Regions:
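A short acidic, often aromatic-flanked loop/helix-cap motif at beta-alpha or helix-coil junctions
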Residues: 68-70, 134-137, 416-417
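Conserved phosphate-handling catalytic cores of large alpha/beta enzymes
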Residues: 77-80, 87-104, 108-178, 187
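Mid-to-C-terminal polyanion-binding domains and interfaces
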Residues: 20, 182, 186, 261-308, ...
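Short, solvent-exposed secondary-structure boundary motifs
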Residues: 90, 320, 325-326, 442-447, ...
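Hydrophobic helix-and-loop "lid/oligomerization" segment in the mid-to-C-terminal part
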Residues: 1-86, 106, 124, 156-388, ...
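Short, solvent-exposed coil/turn elements at secondary-structure transition points
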Residues: 66-68, 116, 132-134, 338, ...
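Alpha-helix N-cap/helix-initiation motif
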Residues: 30, 34, 92, 137-141, ...
C-alpha cells in the first residue's frame, strides 16, 4: 500500500511542478462496498489536496459503472472517457486486463485497489494492491472499502476525517460479507464505537436519523444500512451515484446555505430508503412467483433449480436466488431477460457444500456467453436458446440431492435462568458476521406466559411471523406463525435461538430470535375445553 500512496503523491506533485492539472478518476462499483470505498478515496484525496495546497493542480471525479447498460468493473468505455491522468480502481480492476491495457496505451496511469481473486494473468497497471496476490499482504480478507481506508490512513493525517471514513469502511466490511476476523474485526468494532458517538459523514448521519436507528450494531450494518446502500444500484442503471453522493457528503455548518444543503441531504436519504422498500416489494413478488414457476418449468425433482422468470429485475436476481436456495435447500440459478433483450442474465447461489462454479457452471461452459463466480455465488449470460440445453446438462451431472431435513446445530444448552447473563457475554464476542457467527443456544421446556390474555401474537405485514410471550424475554420467529399454529400452539416448547436487542425510544428491549422449535415432549396435554378457552383468550 505504501507504494500506491507514494505513486499517487508523486503524480500530483509532478503535475504541480509542471503547472498542469492532473485528472484523477476513481472507478468503483455499484454495490455497498464499491460505493463506500469510492466515498473514502474521494474524501481522503480532496482532503490531501487541500491540506497540501495542491487543489488547483488536480480534478477529482468518481465513476461508478452503470449496472444495466455497462455491467461490473472497469470497461473500455470508461477508459474512452479519459485522455490522460490517473485512474484508481477500487473494489474492481484485477480482472480488467483489456481495459487497463487500453489505458496504458493511451498514457493513463492506473492504480488498482481490489480484493477479488486474480486470474492467471495480472493487468499491466502501474500499482496493484490486492491481498490475494502473492506477497501483497499477510491479511487476505479486506473488502474494497477496507483497502481504501488503509490508503486514506497513509495519505492524510486529519484524524476527524479518518474517523468518519472508518465508519464507511465498517459498513462496507459487514455489507460485503467478508470474514469479521483480524483487521476486519478491529475496523468494525471501532466503526460502531464512532457511529454510536455521532461520528460519521453528514450523509451517513442523515441516513441513520431517517432510518430511526438508535444504538447501531453490526446487524444494522448488514441488514438495514447495507441493503439501503445496495438498493439504488440494484433498481436503477446509475442509482449507485446517489449513494456515493450521500455517503461522501460532509456539510459545513458555517456556510450560508447549510440549512438548504441539510434539507437536500435528508431528502436524498428519504429517496434511497424508499428505493429499498421498492426493492423488498419486488423481491417478495419474485419469491411468490417461484412456486408456480418451479411447477410450470418441471423443476421439482432437480438437484439444481434453474428458474426463468420473465418479470424479475436483474438487480434482485441474486437476492431471490439466495432466498430460494435456503427455502428449497438446493442450489438455485435465476435467469431474466437482459435489458438489451438479446440474451438472458443469471445469478446463482448455492446450498450446502456444492461448489457452484466448479460443479455446476464449469461443466456447462460451452452454453454461456460469459460466466464467473466461486463456490457460493455466480453470475452468467446465456443465449435464450441455450437455457434448456443448460438445464438438461445439469440434470445429467453428478450433483447430490442434499438431505432435505433441516438441522440446526447449537453451541450451548441453557436454562431460563441463564438467559439474562448471555447478553452481557455477547458484548465481548461481538461484532458477529461472516467468520464469527452468533452463538446458537438450545433450551428445553420453555413456557409461554400470557400477556393481556394472549400467549402469542402474529406480526409482520402478512401476519406470517410470530411473537411468543416466553420468559424472561419474548421470542420472535420470522415466517414461523403457520408452523406454530399447525402444532396447535403449544404452551411449552424446545427451541434453538439467538439473543438480540432492540433499541427504541431510548429503551432496550431484549428478544430471543427463534431458529427452530417443537412442542416439548413432556408438555401437559390440554383438554379440548382448555384448548378452546386458550384460543379464545388469544384472539380477544
Amino acid at each position: 500500500m505504501d507504494r500506491a500512496v507514494e505513486f499517487f503523491k508523486k503524480k500530483v506533485n509532478d503535475a504541480a511542478e509542471e503547472k498542469e492539472i492532473l485528472q484523477i478518476k476513481i472507478v468503483g462499483d455499484y454495490d455497498a462496498d464499491g460505493m463506500n470505498a469510492s466515498a473514502i478515496l474521494y474524501d481522503a484525496i480532496i482532503s490531501y489536496l487541500k491540506a497540501n495546497s495542491l487543489a488547483e493542480y488536480a480534478e477529482v471525479s468518481v465513476r461508478l459503472p452503470r449496472r444495466y447498460s455497462e455491467g461490473y468493473g472497469l470497461s473500455k468505455k470508461i477508459i474512452d472517457e479519459s485522455e490522460s491522468g490517473l485512474i484508481i480502481t477500487v473494489d474492481n480492476g484485477i480482472a480488467a486486463i483489456d481495459a487497463i491495457k487500453k489505458a496504458k496505451d493511451k498514457g493513463i496511469d492506473v492504480i488498482i485497489l481490489d480484493h477479488h481473486l486474480s486470474g492467471e494473468e495480472l493487468p499491466c497497471a502501474d500499482i496493484i494492491v490486492d491481498p490475494h496476490c502473492e506477497g501483497m499482504s499477510t491479511f487476505k480478507h479486506y473488502c474494497g472499502a477496507g483497502l481504501a481506508y488503509r490508503f486514506a490512513e497513509m495519505l492524510i493525517t486529519n484524524k476527524d476525517l479518518l474517523d468518519k471514513l472508518l465508519v464507511l469502511a465498517g459498513i462496507a466490511t459487514v455489507a460485503d460479507v467478508v470474514p469479521l476476523i483480524g483487521a476486519n474485526r478491529y475496523l468494525v468494532r471501532q466503526s460502531l464505537k464512532l457511529i454510536n458517538r455521532g461520528i460519521a459523514t453528514s450523509g451517513v448521519l442523515a441516513l441513520v436519523r431517517k432510518m430511526r436507528l438508535e444504538k447501531i450494531t453490526a446487524e444494522d450494518y448488514g441488514y438495514k444500512i447495507g441493503p439501503v446502500c445496495n438498493a439504488s444500484g440494484r433498481l436503477l442503471d446509475d442509482g449507485a451515484m446517489d449513494i456515493f453522493h450521500l455517503l461522501s457528503q460532509e456539510l459545513d455548518v458555517f456556510t450560508l446555505d447549510y440549512d438548504e444543503q441539510l434539507l437536500k441531504l435528508h431528502a436524498l436519504a428519504d429517496t434511497v430508503i424508499e428505493r429499498n422498500v421498492d426493492r423488498r416489494r419486488i423481491t417478495e413478488e419474485a419469491l411468490e412467483r417461484s412456486d408456480a414457476l418451479i411447477s410450470q418449468q418441471c423443476l421439482a425433482d432437480d438437484a439444481v433449480y434453474i428458474i426463468y422468470d420473465t418479470q424479475v429485475s436483474e438487480g434482485v436476481m441474486g437476492i431471490v436466488a439466495g432466498k430460494l436456495a435456503e427455502k428449497y435447500m438446493r442450489p438455485v440459478i435465476v435467469f431474466a431477460h437482459a435489458q438489451d433483450g438479446e440474451k438472458l442474465k443469471g445469478s446463482g447461489r448455492t446450498y450446502g457444500n456444492i461448489h457452484l462454479k466448479n460443479q455446476v457452471l464449469d461443466p456447462c461452459k460451452e452454453y454461456f456467453f460469459a460466466y464467473g463466480g466461486h463456490a457460493g455465488a455466480a453470475g452468467m449470460t446465456i443465449p435464450e436458446k441455450n437455457l434448456m440445453l443448460f438445464r438438461n446438462k445439469v440434470r445429467k451431472l453428478d450433483i447430490p440431492v442434499l438431505y432435505r431435513e433441516k438441522r440446526i446445530l447449537y453451541d450451548l444448552e441453557v436454562t431460563k435462568e441463564e438467559i439474562p447473563e448471555l447478553y452481557e457475554k455477547m458484548e465481548f464476542f461481538a461484532p458477529f458476521g461472516e467468520g464469527n457467527p452468533e452463538p446458537v443456544f438450545f433450551i428445553r421446556n420453555l413456557e409461554l406466559s400470557p400477556v393481556r390474555g394472549k400467549f402469542y401474537e402474529q406480526n409482520g405485514s402478512d401476519g406470517k411471523s410470530i411473537k411468543l410471550f416466553t420468559m424472561p424475554y419474548p421470542s420472535s420467529g420470522y415466517q414461523m406463525a403457520a408452523e406454530y399454529l399447525l402444532m396447535d400452539a403449544p404452551k411449552k416448547i424446545d427451541m434453538t435461538f439467538e439473543v438480540y436487542t432492540i433499541y427504541s425510544h431510548g429503551k432496550e428491549h431484549r428478544r430471543l430470535r427463534m431458529l427452530d422449535f417443537c412442542a416439548s415432549k413432556n408438555a401437559e396435554t390440554e383438554t379440548s375445553f382448555k384448548k378452546g378457552l386458550s384460543a379464545m383468550l388469544n384472539f380477544m
